[in-house]
Amino acid sequence: MSDNDKPKLGMRAPLGLKRTVETGQVKQSFSHGRSNTVVVEVKRRRIVPGRPGEAEPQVTEETAAAPVAPAPAPAPAAQAPVAPRPAPAPIPTGRPMTPLERREQQERLLREAEEARMAALEETRRREERAKAEATEEERRRAEENRRAEEEAERAAAAAAAAATAEAETAAAAPREEAPAAAGTAEEAPRTSSSTMPPPRRFTPVPSPKRPEPPRPQQRDRKGDDRRQSGKLTVTRALDDDSGARARSLAALKRAREKDKRAHQAGTVQQKQVRDVAVPETITVGELANRMAERGADLVKALFKMGMPVTVNQSIDQDTAELLVTEFGHNIKRVSDSDVDLITSDDVDAAETLQPRPPVVTIMGHVDHGKTSLLDALRGTDVASGEAGGITQHIGAYQVQVKSGAKITFLDTPGHEAFSEMRARGANITDIVVIVVAGDDGLRPQTIEAISHTRAAGVPMIIAINKMDKPGSNAQRVREALLQHDVQVESMGGDVQEVEVSALKKTGLDELIEKIELQAELLELKANPDRPAEGTVVEATLDKGRGAVATILVGRGTLKVGDIFVVGAESGKVRALIDDKGRNIKEAGPSLPVEILGLSGVPSAGDQLSVVENEARAREVAAYRAGVIHQKRTTAAPASLESMFSALREQKAQQYPVVVKADAQGSVEAIVGSLNKISTDLIQVRILHAGVGGITESDVSLAAASKAPIIGFNVRANAKAREIATRDGVALKYYDVIYDLLDEIRAAMAGQLGPEYLEHVVGRAEIREVFSAGKHGKAAGLLVLEGYIRQKLRARIMRDDVIIYNGSISSLRRFKDDVPEVRAGLECGITLEATTDIKPGDIVETFEVEERERTL
């Protein structure tokens, strides 16, 4: 374009007589993509004739920069050079502009600048739209070329492989001759030079020579530069001689294919997959969405339409979940949380699988009637001498082999009243109950309770009348006393067997064994040993070196080392089995008591043990049972908590907090039950924590927060716990006999309540006259009706049988003399402390207060 063809700047200005100032915009480009737009002006100046010898005046154009160039082409182009600045022209000497002309000129310049800016913006927008359209078209064209190239490459490779198989002799020369033809058919557009294209790869056994890396393309304009490494060999580059052209990546090809696939499937309706959704009693919205394979937002939206504003983390009930499942077209399958638990009541063994098993015999009776001594005589051991206080405080399980070769399993239960739950548990897991009655003591409360437990369990009983070696023993008196409780022995025409024994002299033991074997034969005790084991926890402890240890009485099946089991809310794997003699065994059959190691925690006595198939199932069942226990505890808490706070508000009940630690779970139950029984309406025992094992630092910290003592039953505190207890002032109380424990706790609770005060009324008098007593206020003239009135006694005034004053007598006079005491039938005058509200006819009662030590 020549200089004459350049468009003039500011041609859109209106015509006028004034000199015009042509303006425009020039875009300056810098490195790193920076640019700047400059407004330029073109002024015409007239040069007046100068001195002689100077050139003729001529009109020149002075520009600051070149006008705005059109949009650059995609090909790289150099930046337009800036025109050289001419020499400065002399200042014109014409007349100066008036203010009106100057203002018009400024307005015109502003208008022209705005028009130029708008034109530049419009041009920029058109240029961007053009570039976008070209890029879209280029992308579509390249995708089409790549697709055709891939198809041609596949066809060429297949044809080359077929040709190589048919002509085996010329397999090496044929590819070089046919390479130009194959390359020519691979592309529809003409190529620049076929000799520069590398030969295509042939699928022949001959190894192809190493292909040289194509040269790096020249620097392109940023709009045309793909900014990718060009050393990667692709199918398109192998079949295309234009190695510098941009090639699409594999990810871009995959995206394009997915887009085409979605476009083809847009017209077809996909079939919704109907699922069977298992819905428990409560489920979160997010979990329900996962089971339905739906989006959680869709479920939340559906619930909002139902009027339930919830989030994906909130729980909904089973009925609401059913509405959602039905609305989304799925099938609901209602499940209950209890389905997770093990159900063994319906599991009945076939008759042909049953084999005889030893009987389980429980020894029950009153404390100190000789139960453990009798069992020691049967076993040939001496357990009773090693027990604290000479009383049994745990359930002991033993298996004895008698002279006939048969085996009998014995359970020794405590006789103290605090161990009622242990005796009831022993009666429920036994086959035969032997009730021991001392011949010199007769029937006692725990003996009667043992008879009741036996009847409730529905098991047969045998009466063993012990201590027959003592001079004062009378077996006939015991038999007659049993009749009062509907127990008729065989010697008196009944069906209950009885035997007279002496554990000390070991007499009558053989007869007792014979009666047990006879009763067991009548019961026909059988069990299936070839099945997963089931049993009952007799006792559970926490050993410092072995961890949680439970004594299990196997009911049916065979418990083996390595079995995975669930017991109550605990699970575990059998690491060791120890029998009653302390020997490690590999397996335990029916009716055999064993200690098991490997529990995750200490179970409760009486929990059922069941062997399961794997650890996941065991953890699932244990977690469900723990949740049930926690739910029961939390749901029962509000009522008791509310009643406790209401009692505290009314100052009716005090709290005596304690922390209980014992050596066995059964002992914990007995202690907690006994402490709750000694609570009264005035003071109640609050169990902060009750557990099995030694006293630890956490127990001391818990007790220190509530200023509570720690009760250790057959356990001790470690060194660190003792140090913290001394520092925080926590009382550590150790016991090994439950009698002493209950007596001391009862005394401590009574001491916290303080002494009780009893009132004894000693006199009654009637006020006959009221008169002034100077500084004492008012004095009352009395007639003593009953008893006596003494100075400094406590007194109360009653008016119409309502107490209106409670205080003490400050002075007592008869006539004008102070007297210490006035008896019935005499008159006197008194003044009372801090009251003047007395009238004739009121009754005065005097009483003494007796302080007495409180007992529970």
From Swiss-Prot:
Residues 83-93, 197-209 have a biased composition (Pro residues). The keyword Nuclease does not apply. Residues 22-38 have a biased composition (Polar residues). One of its GO terms (molecular function) is GTP binding. Residues 466-469 are annotated as: G4. GTP binds at residues 365-372, 412-416, 466-469. Pfam families: EF-G_D2, GTP_EFTU, IF-2, IF2_assoc, IF2_N. Residues 156-196 have a biased composition (Low complexity). This is Translation initiation factor IF-2.
